[in-house]
Amino acid sequence: MKDKRRVKRDLPKINERIRFPNIRVISGDGEQLGIMTPAEALAIAEEEDLDLVLVSETAKPPVCRIMDYGKYKFEQEKRAREAKKKQHNADLKEVKMRYKIEEHDYQVRVNSAQRFLKSGDKVKATITFRGREIQHSNLAQKLLDRMAKDLEEVGEIQQRPKREGRNMMMILAPKKST
């Protein structure tokens, strides 16, 4: 059976939905019209065929603006889309290798890590040990330190090399651009 409690909708506060004794009103061209009741402000807005939109609820008294609500909503959505487009979420990319890696293979890993860091992603460099190779963790440590040194122009160490089970790993983050 469905729950029949009322769901409070997050409706925008415009026109008749503004419930305050007094509000500060700003006209469409940015001119302050002063403090008045919502009914008086709504009458002015309707004269101009515009809406009364609550801009700041926390101000004393609350601030309302006379404007075209459809246009205002469109502008807000457009700004939100632009902000989302500019935002880049840093992913964690992984570069795997063994401690007995050949020079060319190592350079390939460094180049791919460099590409990831330049695109703004974090890089997790992992060295895997098999069998008794785990005894040579000092060689893996040296290899990760060398990789950090080779990538110091584009990245900085976020997590120092450490051993986890049969792996040794290090995390590099892109350098902050100044």
Swiss-Prot record:
Predominant location category: cytoplasm
GO-annotated molecular function: ribosome binding; translation initiation factor activity
GO biological process, any: ribosome disassembly
Keywords: Cytoplasm, Initiation factor, Protein biosynthesis
Pfam families xref list: IF3_C (PF00707), IF3_N (PF05198)
Superkingdom of origin: Bacteria
GO CC terms: cytosol; membrane
Localization terms from the record: Cytoplasm
Disulfide bonding pattern of the chain: none
Classification via InterPro entries: T_IF-3_C_sf, T_IF-3_N_sf, Translation_initiation_fac3_CS, Translation_initiation_fac_3, Translation_initiation_fac_3_C, Translation_initiation_fac_3_N
Keyword Transcription regulation: no
Keyword Cytoplasm: yes
Function, in words: IF-3 binds to the 30S ribosomal subunit and shifts the equilibrium between 70S ribosomes and their 50S and 30S subunits in favor of the free subunits, thus enhancing the availability of 30S subunits on which protein synthesis initiation begins.
Family: Belongs to the IF-3 family.
Subunit composition and interactions: Monomer.
Family matches, as PANTHER family: TRANSLATION INITIATION FACTOR IF-3, TRANSLATION INITIATION FACTOR IF-3, MITOCHONDRIAL
Entry protein name: Translation initiation factor IF-3
Species for this entry: Picosynechococcus sp. (strain ATCC 27264 / PCC 7002 / PR-6)
GN (gene name): infC
